[in-house]
Amino acid sequence: MSDAEAVLLLEELKRLKQENELLRQKLDALARRIFGVKSEQLDKNQLLLLLQEVETPGPVLGKGSGPEAELAEPPRPNKASSSKPRDRKPRLPEHLPVVEEVIEPEPFKAAPQEWRRIGEEVSERLDYEPAKFLRRRTVRPKYVKRHEIDAVPVIAPLPNSLLERSVVTPGLLAQIIVSKYCDHMPLYRQESIYWSRHEVWLPRQTMAEWVGLAADWLKPIYRQIREEVLEGGYVQIDETPIRYLEPGHGKTKLGYLWTYGTPKEDVVFHWETSRAAACLENILPVEFRGVAQCDGYQAYRSFARSRDDAIVLAGCMAHVRRKFFEAQEQAPKVPGWILWQMRNLYTIESQLRETRAGPNLRAAIRGSQSRMIMNRLHHTLIALKTSRRFLPRSLMGAAIDYALSQWSTLLVYLDDGRLEIDNNLIENAIRPTAVGRKNWLFIGQAEAGERSAILYTIIENCRRRGLDPFSYLKEVFTRLPSMTNWQVKDITPKAWARRQCIVPLQAAA
């Protein structure tokens, strides 16, 4: 074997080793994602051990030097003075109706006249009665005047109904929709439950028609929610895949449920059969001017460029953090240092939320504290990229490249106090659809995707506003047939909760 051949073999061996290492990293990352702990929380003591040998340029938010200073947390407010004691919920909810059962002792029942009552002992337990169907019969008496036999009789008109000549009522329709889109129960399961437990036969095809017509009735409310979300000039946006049935082929294709909304406000679901940049034209209208916060998917950049300077993209720190978290197995020390700097960024955000800081104060604090951490992170990432210490295709190399490619968008939140540090709030809104997708696997044809988007929008905004979706939908379905378009703004979940003085759920904030 010649020297040249030996060199080629050594290079090939080196390449194969690198490729094998990359494949092992990807396999380990996939195994952790499927079987491992889902939490991305960091252990402070573990990171301190890893960072003992890391030279740090100086403290971020604490005094001194070294890894202990780098890991020092920003001072938190005194919990004893700032945190409110949690309200202890009653063992049995006070609002429930009471069914009282009196149990008399046997000696008293045998001779009640010989006994005198001196007190009682009361105990309560929680009981449940299953839901039940009932036949709602509407009787409209006819009348004629006593002395005018030939006069036209009078009779009360039938109340307006969503579905004429249908047996469904607002209550039943609300129950079917809530069961599917809130409790993730497919129509075929509802069909089985109603028949086996109640002996009521409701074919799934009939229920599907009712759901479709209900979505059509709710479209004006959906459009009103969308209009209110877009008028704020700041939206968070993400998309999730959902399979739908391809007409005439019996096969499924991949569609996408795009989700966008404003933190602490409403959210909108939008159905498209792809995730191309052109889909965003149907989501953000031409007149929209403002900030769109999203992940690093290329379609967002292409769309923003097509709108010139009308749309500013803000990045998502959580996506960047997740990639470094997955790269810890490859080189724990370097990702650990980066992750802790990001932890300091999130600690600042937590303090701002605890103090209920407004947009101006948020921007000022971020400019004085968060920007310093971001600058340090940027210098470190550039140094790591220049050193070529990590292969570009490795988990760490990919994390570095992704962070640097998104850096300009990650800085946007520093100067605008309205913005969040990441896109997690809109991703949380998508989670219920993932649970439903596991149960019903795919939706009907593409048109069903649009109806699902409308109904998911209503259900999710009820949840965010602390409303019972069943009660809300039942009342709305009762009122809608008698309402005009200009009255729609008064029956959105937001307006409904405001009239009832309901505080939005903290989880949605």
Task: Go through each PLM region and give its residues.
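Short, amphipathic alpha-helical "recognition" segments used to contact nucleic acids or chromatin
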Residues: 169-183
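Short helix/loop capping segments that flank catalytic or ligand/cofactor-binding pockets
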Residues: 116-119, 153-156, 244-246, 268-270, ...
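Gly/Pro-rich turn-and-neighbor structural signature
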Residues: 92-112, 116, 188-287, 352-418, ...
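Short, flexible loop/hinge motifs at secondary-structure junctions
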Residues: 1-167, 236-237, 243, 294, ...
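Acidic/histidine-rich catalytic cores and adjacent linkers
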Residues: 297-299, 340-509
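Conserved beta-strand -> loop -> alpha-helix junction used to position metal-binding or nucleic-acid-contacting
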Residues: 234-235, 291, 296, 304-341
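Flexible loop/turn segments at secondary-structure boundaries
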Residues: 184-186, 215-217, 242-246, 267, ...
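Mobile genetic element proteins and their domesticated derivatives, centered on retroelements
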Residues: 36, 108-111, 145, 176, ...
